[in-house]
């Protein structure tokens, strides 16, 4: 029996090869795999000796040979194939263990284009696909985690079962598809082409979820193959607590996205059902958290918390005072972990030091939404710099009002449309979102904020279609307003702001969120 081993991921390689030899397999290999096996004293033959054809073009052509692919693809149940293989001296290959050149890792390292191109595997995918196609006669192993199961079946049954071969086949085609998708994505990025004519996405399963958004829905969590430099939920380390749910992950991502709007100072964000119910910044993290929680303590119960500085004991103690679903932060002090360990179901996620950096920013990537029969892609929304804002009222905002408008505008982008946000310079005061008309969003925010809205800034994610929403905001006590503008009634809105003595700024950019 012949087995061909050629792997870039050498985890478990030597024990697997030793097990195959014990079972009577003769091994073929190339390059670094060959050297690793020889170095471990495993008997192995060079592929070029088997094919009687040298490796050429600096190793670009090693396994692309009839004695390899004929041995893999031969349909042994067909007499014609067997006779043809015999005539050409082709021996069947019954097991192929291959994983591909480290293309993704090379891209992630920042390597130059020529080096990346050399890591586009040709022979490997050809062998994997050929082996998977002929799964009735060939076991194809692309994942070292499958080595023990394959060896166990060979030892117990003298063969790999059809069920296992079918499972390995599916895994193999998924492996090559993801590999090609990564190459395609890199080439599109190199060309500055965000929306290619053909789109392939490559993700790997992080975990099966207990269920989806609701218990009757199935769910799973997938992530990119390589961890980005920016902080993410997908690559955060879970330190304690219950298994993450589908809704936890969505809310954690929403919390992290909003938190990254405030990298310069300690900040706290509380999210409930993908909606901000508390946001604050302060010189001390514990004060930021307490201020954020005080915005809406009822909604904060059972919420998701995101923090952008290491969690200290004081902040941990403050969080332990109420029921929370999950917390994501750059890190936790030993004392904080000791405090939070008493909350055994509380999920603690560590996003890493990048989240604590004053230069932390959201990752520049596309947002995807599935629709029936297709998918929508768009650039991730961003907040334009205040330099592009235009004062249109008679009265210019004071420095304090300008700071409050900046804060409100950053938060407003993260509230479902129609979105209205009242804020001071360092905290959310109230928000109203998800309504089908803007004046109702204003009124909901007013009901939540009450007297705290006096002297506040109000932000609207899109223009006010009528002055009624602005009139209500003024009645609530807002002294300044930031909005995109662009309504046919802009002049009427500006006049209303002047009538109320409000400062009005137009950003020229809308931030709908659906």
UniProtKB/Swiss-Prot annotation:
Family: Belongs to the PurH family.
The name this protein goes by in its record: Bifunctional purine biosynthesis protein PurH
Gene transcribed to yield this protein: purH
GO cellular component: cytosol
Recorded catalytic activity of this chain's protein: (6R)-10-formyltetrahydrofolate + 5-amino-1-(5-phospho-beta-D-ribosyl)imidazole-4-carboxamide = 5-formamido-1-(5-phospho-D-ribosyl)imidazole-4-carboxamide + (6S)-5,6,7,8-tetrahydrofolate; IMP + H2O = 5-formamido-1-(5-phospho-D-ribosyl)imidazole-4-carboxamide
Pathway: Purine metabolism; IMP biosynthesis via de novo pathway; 5-formamido-1-(5-phospho-D-ribosyl)imidazole-4-carboxamide from 5-amino-1-(5-phospho-D-ribosyl)imidazole-4-carboxamide (10-formyl THF route): step 1/1; Purine metabolism; IMP biosynthesis via de novo pathway; IMP from 5-formamido-1-(5-phospho-D-ribosyl)imidazole-4-carboxamide: step 1/1
Domains as described in the record: The IMP cyclohydrolase activity resides in the N-terminal region.
Pfam families the UniProt entry points to: AICARFT_IMPCHas, MGS
GO function terms (MF aspect): IMP cyclohydrolase activity; phosphoribosylaminoimidazolecarboxamide formyltransferase activity
PROSITE patterns: MGS
Keywords: Hydrolase, Multifunctional enzyme, Purine biosynthesis, Transferase
SMART domains for this protein: AICARFT_IMPCHas (SM00798), MGS (SM00851)
Top-level division of the source organism's lineage: Bacteria
Its EC number(s): 2.1.2.3, 3.5.4.10
Start and end residues of each MGS-like domain: 1-142
GO BP terms, alphabetized: 'de novo' IMP biosynthetic process
Natural source organism: Myxococcus xanthus (strain DK1622)
InterPro entries for this protein: AICAR_Tfase_dup_dom_sf, Cytidine_deaminase-like, MGS-like_dom, MGS-like_dom_sf, PurH-like
């Amino acid at each position: 029996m012949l087995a061909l081993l050629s792997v870039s991921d050498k985890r478990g390689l030597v024990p697997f090869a030793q097990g195959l030899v014990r079972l009577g397999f003769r091994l073929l290999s190339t390059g670094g795999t060959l050297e690793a096996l020889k170095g471990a004293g495993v008997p192995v033959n060079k592929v070029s000796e088997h094919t009687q054809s040298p490796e050429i073009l600096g190793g670009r052509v090693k396994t692309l040979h009839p004695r390899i692919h004929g041995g893999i693809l031969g349909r042994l149940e067909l007499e014609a194939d067997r006779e043809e293989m015999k005539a050409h001296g082709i021996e069947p290959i019954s097991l192929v263990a291959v994983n591909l050149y480290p293309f993704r890792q090379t891209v992630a390292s920042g390597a130059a284009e020529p080096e990346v191109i050399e890591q586009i595997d040709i022979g490997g995918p050809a062998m994997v696909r050929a082996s998977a196609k002929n799964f009735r006669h060939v076991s194809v192993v692309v994942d070292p985690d499958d080595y023990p199961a394959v060896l166990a079946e060979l030892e117990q049954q003298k063969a790999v079962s059809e069920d296992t071969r079918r499972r390995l086949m599916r895994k193999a085609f998924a492996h090559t598809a993801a590999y090609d998708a990564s190459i395609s994505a890199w080439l599109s990025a190199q060309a500055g082409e965000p929306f290619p004519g053909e789109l392939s996405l490559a993700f790997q399963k992080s975990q099966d979820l207990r269920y989806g958004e609701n218990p009757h829905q199935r769910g799973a969590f997938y992530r990119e193959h390589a961890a980005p430099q920016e902080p993410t939920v997908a690559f955060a380390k879970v330190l304690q607590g219950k298994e993450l749910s589908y809704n936890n992950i969505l809310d954690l991502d929403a919390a992290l996205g909003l938190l990254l709007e405030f990298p310069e100072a300690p900040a706290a964000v509380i999210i409930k059902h993908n909606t901000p119910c508390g946001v604050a910044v302060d010189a001390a993290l514990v004060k930021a958290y307490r201020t954020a929680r005080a915005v809406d303590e009822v909604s904060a119960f059972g919420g998701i918390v995101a923090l952008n500085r290491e969690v200290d004991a004081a902040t941990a103690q403050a969080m332990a005072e109420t029921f929370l679903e999950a917390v994501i932060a750059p890190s936790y002090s030993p004392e904080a972990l000791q405090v939070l360990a008493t909350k055994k179901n509380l999920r603690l996620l560590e996003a890493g030091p990048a989240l604590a950096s004053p230069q932390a920013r959201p990752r520049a990537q596309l947002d995807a939404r599935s629709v029936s029969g297709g998918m929508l892609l768009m650039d991730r929304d961003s907040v334009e710099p205040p330099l592009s804002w235009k004062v249109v009222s008679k009265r210019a905002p004071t420095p304090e009002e300008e700071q409050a408008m900046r804060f409100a505008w950053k938060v407003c982008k993260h509230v479902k449309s129609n979105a209205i946000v009242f804020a001071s310079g360092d905290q959310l005061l109230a928000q109203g979102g998800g309504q089908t008309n803007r004046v109702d969003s204003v009124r909901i925010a007013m009901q939540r904020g009450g007297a705290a809205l006096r002297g506040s800034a109000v932000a609207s994610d899109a223009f006010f279609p009528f002055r009624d929403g602005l009139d209500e905001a003024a009645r609530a006590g807002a002294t300044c307003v930031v909005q995109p503008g662009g309504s046919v009634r802009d002049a009427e809105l500006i006049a209303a702001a002047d009538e109320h003595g409000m400062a009005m700024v137009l950003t020229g950019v809308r931030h709908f969120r659906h």
